[in-house]
Amino acid sequence: MIREPFRYRETFAAILADTPAHADAAKRGMIAARQVLECYIARDPFFASTFFPYEPETDETLICHMANAAAHAGVGPMATVAGAIAAAGINAMMDAGATFGVIDNGGDIALVSDRDVRVGVHAGSAPVSDRIAFIVPPQEQHSYGICTSSATVGPSISFGMADAVTIFARDPLDADAWATAVCNRIRPDDHRVLETIDPSRVDGVYAIMGESVVSWGKVPPVVPARVDEQLIAAGDRL
């Protein structure tokens, strides 16, 4: 297995692949997706700035997919951008014949895998941060999403207070959108946002808020781990 950093404009990702050819396919897929997105935003800047669901005036598949996933979660379409770019890379890897690939796009992960994958959890100053991992079972049929949103870690805009909200979903864009939505609204004493989740779109939720941990739906096994924060894909490390 190889691990390659990838940087293109605002995308800072890490690619895990079995072969250099599969990693190269991932890079091409992510670049192509970014180019489609940038071309559309040039025509419709509001798509990039709104925090609310938005119906784009286009039939471009990527743009419509982003808007649809965001609308179901009640957030703006750019809440799905990291998941969308990562998913594009994984889909390109699969088209190139890959049965294993992981793309970490700043804490938002898309993967396809014929084996178990261990995904560590970084949650800022929370007690469990860097001490646990999920054992994600094989996901061989399509790209799978494991996306994390945080109000205390990283540069992304958040209206919440959670140290980490991780969403597991069969579509990385759904995972990304719902990570934002849940992180914005969940509180240690208020979990009502979980009642709004469509279980046909989201498999599970794992939310960390200081010493409080909330789990919903089908979450992969959680095991003790020693997580190296430096392995998280971020702009200051690539």
Curated annotation (Swiss-Prot):
Lineage top rank: taxon: Archaea
Name used for this protein in its record: UPF0280 protein Mboo_1274
Organism: Methanoregula boonei (strain DSM 21154 / JCM 14090 / 6A8)
Family: Belongs to the UPF0280 family.
NCBIfam families found in the cross-reference section: PRK04334.1-4 (NF003324)
Lineage, opening ranks: Archaea, Methanobacteriati, Methanobacteriota, Stenosarchaea group, Methanomicrobia
SUPFAM superfamilies in the cross-refs: ApbE-like (SSF143631)
